[in-house]
């Protein structure tokens, strides 16, 4: 493998990491409050609102049901308006964020559902407001589950970023498609696959360590 190709792969790793973590961050900025809203408005919860819950849940389900490659193409006009282009690293972050947010929202809701209802009832009996319950009971108790959700999300985004590379998003996906598939270079294709596997392994390893660190003994 030539030196220019090696540097291209290094840049591809950097672009893949940037797409994954930046879109993961913005995905959580959107998905975390939506997930909390889904939980607290469920029937029987602290601010139960069946109509609001059904509406938000339906929107989340709609976006979750769209395959990412279709979402990527569908969002090209919106991406161009937001970042001024429909190709490249910055452009990829927009559909990646939109694709991740509803997934994160459901993961957050599921993590909160694991919390014993007795803790919430005790907090309500002590006069805690809904916001206090969310900040001081729900989120701290669900922290291991939230970290696990973040790990799964980041791993999913690694795969999404590779798909985005096939339509000019950059990263390892574009290198694998352009130089490996189109260029019939098996060495490049296999190297890209190995690098993606390593990235996934490292993210999972770090996530597992953090979960163990925040899990209360």
Curated annotation (Swiss-Prot):
Q: How does it sit in the membrane?
A: Multi-pass membrane protein
Mention one GO biological process in which this protein takes part, according to its record. Answer: methionine transport
Keywords assigned by UniProt? Amino-acid transport, Cell inner membrane, Cell membrane, Membrane, Transmembrane, Transmembrane helix, Transport
Q: Which residues lie on this side of the membrane: Periplasmic?
A: 1-19, 79-80, 173-185
Query: Knockout consequence?
Result: Disruption confers resistance to cellular contact-dependent growth inhibition (CDI) CdiA of E.coli strain MHI813, but not to several other tested CdiA toxins.
Q: What are the GO MF terms of this UniProt record?
A: ABC-type D-methionine transporter activity; L-methionine transmembrane transporter activity
- Give a single Pfam family match: BPD_transp_1
Q: Has keyword Membrane?
A: yes
Q: Which top-level group of life is the source organism from?
A: Bacteria
Q: Where is the ABC transmembrane type-1 domain?
A: 13-204
SUPFAM superfamilies, sorted? MetI-like
The chain's coiled-coil residues are none
Q: Describe its function.
A: Part of the binding-protein-dependent transport system for D-methionine and the toxic methionine analog alpha-methyl-methionine. Probably responsible for the translocation of the substrate across the membrane.
Q: Which family does it belong to?
A: Belongs to the binding-protein-dependent transport system permease family. CysTW subfamily.
- What this protein is called in its record is D-methionine transport system permease protein MetI
Which source organism?
Answer: Escherichia coli (strain K12)
The lineage is: Bacteria, Pseudomonadati, Pseudomonadota, Gammaproteobacteria, Enterobacterales
């Amino acid at each position: 493998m030539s030196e220019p190709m090696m540097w291209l792969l290094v840049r591809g790793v950097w672009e893949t990491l940037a797409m994954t973590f930046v879109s993961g961050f913005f995905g959580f900025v959107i998905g975390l409050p939506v997930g909390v809203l889904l939980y607290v408005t469920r029937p029987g919860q602290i601010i139960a609102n069946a109509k609001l819950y059904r509406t938000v849940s339906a929107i989340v389900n709609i976006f979750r049901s769209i395959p990412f490659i279709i979402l990527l193409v569908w969002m090209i006009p919106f991406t161009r308006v937001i970042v001024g282009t429909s190709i490249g690293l910055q452009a990829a972050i927009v559909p990646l964020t939109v694709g991740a947010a509803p997934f994160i929202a459901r993961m957050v809701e599921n993590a909160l559902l694991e919390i014993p209802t007795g803790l919430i009832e005790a907090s309500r009996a002590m006069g805690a407001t809904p916001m206090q319950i969310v900040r001081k009971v729900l989120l701290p108790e669900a922290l291991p589950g939230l970290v696990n959700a973040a790990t799964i999300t980041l791993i999913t985004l690694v795969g999404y970023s590779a798909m985005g590379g096939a339509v000019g998003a950059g990263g390892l996906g574009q290198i694998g498609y352009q130089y490996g598939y189109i260029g019939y270079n098996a060495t490049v294709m296999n190297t890209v696959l190995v690098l993606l596997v390593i990235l996934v392994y490292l993210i999972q390893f770090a996530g597992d360590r953090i979960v163990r660190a925040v899990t209360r003994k």
